[in-house]
Amino acid sequence: MVRYTPVNGSMLEHQKTSPWPTNCLPMFEANPTRPRVFGVPLGVDFPQALLDGILARLDPERPDAIAKICLITATTRMERRLTDLLRARGPGFLPQLHQVGNLDGLIPLADVPAADDGLATQLELAQMVRALLKTDPGFQAESAAFELADGLIKIIGEIAGEGVDPDLIINSAIAEHHSEYWQKSRAFLELVQGYVAQSGKISTEMRQRLLVEALTVSWTQNPPNHPVLIAGSTGSRGTTRALMALVARLPQGAVILPGVDYDVGPTVWDTLQHAKIREDHPQFCVLDVAQRLGQEPGEIPRWTKDNAPLPARNKLVSLALRPAPVTDSWLSDGPHLKDLDKAVAGLSYLEAPSSRIEALAIALRMRKAAQDGLRVALITPDRVLTRQVTAALQRWQIEPDDSAGVPLSQSPPGRLIRQVARLIGRDLTSSALVALLKHPLVNTADRGEHLRHSRDLELDYLRKACPVPTLAGCQKWAEKRDGSSRMEWVDWIWSCLQPLKNVTTDQFEVMLARHLKAVSDLAAGPGGETSSELWAMQAGEAASATMAALEDASSSGGSVTPTEYQRVVESVLSTQEVRNPIVPHPDIMIWGTLEARVQGADLAILAGLNDSVWPEMPAPDPWLNRDMRLAAGLLLPERRIGLSAHDFQQAIASREVLITRSKRVDGTETVPSRWINRITNLLTGLPQDGRNKLAEMRARGNYWLDLAEQIETPRGASPRAKRPAPCPPVSARPRQLSVTTIEKLVRDPFAIYARYVLGLRPLDQLDVFPDAAMRGTALHEILQAFVETTKEALPGDPEAHLMEIGAQILNQRAPWPATRALWTAKLRRFASPFILSEQDRRRFAKPHRTELRGQLLRSSVGFTLTGTADRVDLTPDGRALIYDYKSGATPTQKVQDKINKQLQLLALMGEVGAFMDSSTLDVEATAYLSLNTADRMKLHSYKPGEIKEIGREFDRLIAAFDTPTQGYMSRRIPEPDRGYGHEYDSLARYGEWEDSDPPVPVDLTRLEARRDP
């Protein structure tokens, strides 16, 4: 056993003999003259080459020798791959595997404190940041405090990981010359630095550096005599580089770098060493490690004798990706490239018109590879594209092995948690309530009954002009449905959601407890089922663990608003991922660029190669600009691009590669990745028939693009629809219509057919928004109430009386304060001219009835006409004036005579006494009362016998539609400004035919007869 005691804080020393075996066989020559660094060429399967090199250096007579090797890998996935390769060789020993990010196994008893709970620290810092933002509101919104705290934690962690003194940045001479914005940023950095110093907490990056320092002391004093290897890392972090330097100098230590480009010449290496902007080159990471270890990058020995599988392609790509200062070498070195045929033989290039077609083409190629028994890997950082490819593969019931899984926020438990969080402190909307009730994890105990209630509530209440759902409204719906179970169900919903409504500002832990209780109660259902599916399966377990961690840290959250709380929950959930529980296809994989470094496939598909996607543009740093980072020794934004370029260079070195990109994404034109531009530009200018080679690459890619477009194109020519004019049996035609729908019968008979023959009615909107129709309805009610209350005489101040009634009705009809204010202003502008015109009307007639309903049976055609007169006035001699309120533009008299017969038919109903509780009316005139102040009232007086002629015209219209051969033509007389988009235009397939096309009658009586037994 090894015991370590602290010396000078983090310094460690041995107290007993090292546990490592002393009879280890040497893997390398003892006492190296310089640090050992090896490389593996581009295109070589790195884990396989690593294992081959280890076994080649061991005594085959000592199978246990590998067990004495300490192997430090870059990632868990690489460790897993090595284990799989060793197991595939049969029974044997495994090396002692560790990871760069987890060194505790190398110093099990190190006196290094554990890293602090990052979530609790972030919540505490968010409080401090929020307080600082209150003093300077212009810097950022207070609701962004949690995200700003996360950014500060990351930069402090980076400072610790790179071993930079924070005071060097805060008190930097460069910073003194920067803008006022930096002075604000410095205040935040000082805040975090003071918090870290006072709390004594250490971040994960700081702990990692302390472990490396402890390991350095331990191995410097007592160097291990067994082999120690660090493999697969490019030293992108300062702590990792320090560990690599330590291992490379051990007597039996070595560093093995992946993806070394052995075609880079001295000129390029020299350029990379002296160029100002050099970190975006794919081999800069190799150069940086080599320089820090005192090694010339061009002299790095190979770990094995394996050569690159496609040296010609490596040379081509290496030349294409040379730094900008030496791209003139394309002209000198390009013509000397050999074996261009071999370089591009397995390379295909596909440019799709859209990301959807790109995803389908990729899915087709992956399906073909699986059919041929090949291992295929889709490599891309674009998670939207990977989801599209996954969806496309489901066409053939193929589930890919996605290394990234699904974000927890997109899983069923994550979505439910987010949906409920969005309800805290907000008014419940109909759409939010329906989405919540239809969530698959809500009320899983009695799901069938729950879905029936949800559907009925939506159709009977939420879609019936319900601006804001209320408990009273839901209870009224339940009473109408006459079911105790529905009332219990409604009470359960509101018992879950009511505690969330009136929350303003509260302690984070209180808000979290209220939130989680609502989520659990919704999942349990009215019966309080404890065994709900919310926390079950992988996604549920991950959600439970994440929310438990948030609960543990919640006491550090302080006082937050609902918006701030929601952003915290969203941020925490988005950082976690869940693996798909469905067993995937073993040979169809989706990798990120990091996974592609340590695994191999027969076919690599490099997708989403657009600039800003691959490579991804560095995110703006709100704290330090590039000059300050450079002066402090922190990583530059270009380093991330360089690492991404290194991943691309390794992936394109595979034997068979398909490169894809989409020309447009979400309707926006894209730019090809800079690496693709370089390769295509180089090929275009090569004299070795490079232009034709590029054309061959495109042709191979276009094969899959053509397949994708073919699979999306319907087979055979689909005939265009004709302008419909269905002729249903007369018995199926409507025998009753209202006066307002007669215009529809004249203008668009097909709409009458769809609504009254087929029984198709569009669903009402789920969320009611204030629009012109709703405003017109409200004004209609206001005027009706005004007339009812002033029948006998106008009050002394009629305008004030109108505004008083308007305030009462708008409070009910317009629950939105801003809308209510706008409509009140509209009413105030309308009130004065309306009162003046009302005074004129009452000089020759007085209000008699409002909302006068009636129906008229025309026995000659067996048809019932229904209608409602908004207002009927009587003159002193008993003659009637019929008015109809119109919120839109009033139709001209010509339109009323030919098409809009509403007022004329109301006059007909009045003349024959069709209105309820009313005798026959001697109708003198009709008019529209415009709710628009710009329109004046225009009375239409009827001549003797004119109303009777209106009745005869109506009978002729109905008789015409009672003719079996008369079809219900679509858009017979379309409204001038209607265009496309009427509720039944899609059913009529308008757009496949034009308004000038003749109608095609379709006799439906034969279909009716065929259905009869």
Label the model's feature ranges.
Residues 525-527, 667, 716-1013:
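RecB-family 4Fe-4S metal-dependent nuclease core
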Residues 2, 6-793, 803, 807-813, ...:
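Polyanion-engaging groove/track-forming segments
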